[in-house]
């Protein structure tokens, strides 16, 4: 077979196929995660009630239809300072809602934190949304969240960014990229299975490592900028995806981190998670990295390790966000 024919065959898969596979895989990962809940997980989820505090919903932070957040205010409003925990929802950047995390946010509020779930504009074929745009919406929201807490008598002096999957990705971006500009110190980030970087060679789960055209198309959608095949070939795409690559910003704001990843993940590449671990180590971050060797994106096959991860989350919250 001639080189020209090989090249044509190599480029035969349309970009939209790769994008569709990515979205469907993310959705499947989210579904598996939500359906499979071990018994111990009840320790970290609480059904909301007025005994916990006050819930304020759908507070606007911007002009977009999705630019709204829910604020969970603990019943004890007598303390001088409060820690804020923002937990961002999963959904592959295309689905999901802040209400999906009501039990997690209620649990955080029951521990004495001001908790917040933030919606962001989900990508559709019509709006050409991107991870970059979503990360900028989160950056826009944080000062409004803190201001709203202050209006209700809760002075925020520190905060934690957290989330699952896509939400974890956005939480890490804010922590490492934008945290040094936050209204209050970001002292901790935690989450699971969020993509932290975009290296072509890591994304073999979608065949992007073998197809420059599809890789350029996928990364363009994620980054919200045009990335060409030539950019992929000569490596210049790295600068274009840097704004959405949380790992690349750790040196900017090396915040304590607790993360969990499945080695069998077919939604976001585990190779990228290893890059995150290396960066955390290199920057001497106080971190815990939990590797789940039998699990995919839902972390469903390593319950004991998943429990250790959540125990570490509590330990780090107590250490860096003590309720006093």
Regions found by a protein language model. Name each.
Residues 1-13:
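N-terminal Lys/Arg-rich, disordered targeting/topogenic segments
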Residues 11-324:
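Alpha/beta-hydrolase superfamily serine-hydrolase fold, recognizing
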């Amino acid at each position: 077979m001639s080189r020209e024919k090989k090249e044509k065959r190599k480029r035969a898969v349309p970009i939209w196929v790769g994008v569709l596979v990515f979205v469907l895989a993310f959705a499947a990962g989210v579904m598996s995660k939500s359906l499979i809940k071990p018994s111990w997980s009840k320790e970290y989820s609480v059904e909301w009630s007025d005994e916990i505090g006050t819930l304020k919903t759908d507070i606007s932070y911007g002009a977009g239809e999705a630019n709204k957040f829910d604020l969970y205010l603990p019943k004890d409003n007598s303390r001088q300072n409060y820690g804020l925990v923002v937990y961002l929802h999963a959904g592959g950047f295309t689905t999901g809602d802040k209400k999906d995390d009501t039990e997690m946010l209620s649990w955080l509020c029951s521990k004495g934190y001001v908790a917040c779930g933030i919606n962001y504009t989900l990508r559709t074929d019509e709006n050409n949304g991107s991870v970059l745009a979503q990360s900028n919406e989160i950056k826009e929201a944080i000062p409004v969240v803190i201001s709203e807490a202050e209006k209700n008598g809760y002075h925020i002096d520190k905060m934690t960014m957290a989330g699952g999957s896509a939400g974890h990705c956005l939480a890490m971006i804010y922590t490492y990229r934008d945290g040094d500009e936050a209204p209050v110190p970001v002292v901790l980030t935690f989450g699971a299975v969020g993509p932290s970087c975009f290296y072509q060679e890591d994304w073999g789960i979608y065949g992007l490592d073998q197809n420059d055209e599809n890789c350029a198309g996928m990364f363009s959608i994620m980054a919200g900028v045009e990335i060409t095949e030539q950019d992929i070939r000569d490596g210049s795409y790295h600068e274009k995806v840097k704004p959405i690559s949380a790992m690349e910003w750790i040196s900017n704001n090396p915040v304590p981190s607790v993360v969990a990843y499945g080695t069998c993940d077919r939604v976001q590449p585990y190779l990228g998670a290893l890059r995150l671990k290396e960066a955390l180590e290199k920057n001497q971050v106080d971190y815990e990295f939990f590797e789940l060797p039998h699990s995919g994106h839902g972390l469903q096959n390593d319950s004991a390790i998943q429990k250790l991860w959540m125990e570490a989350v509590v330990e780090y919250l107590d250490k860096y966000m003590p309720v006093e």
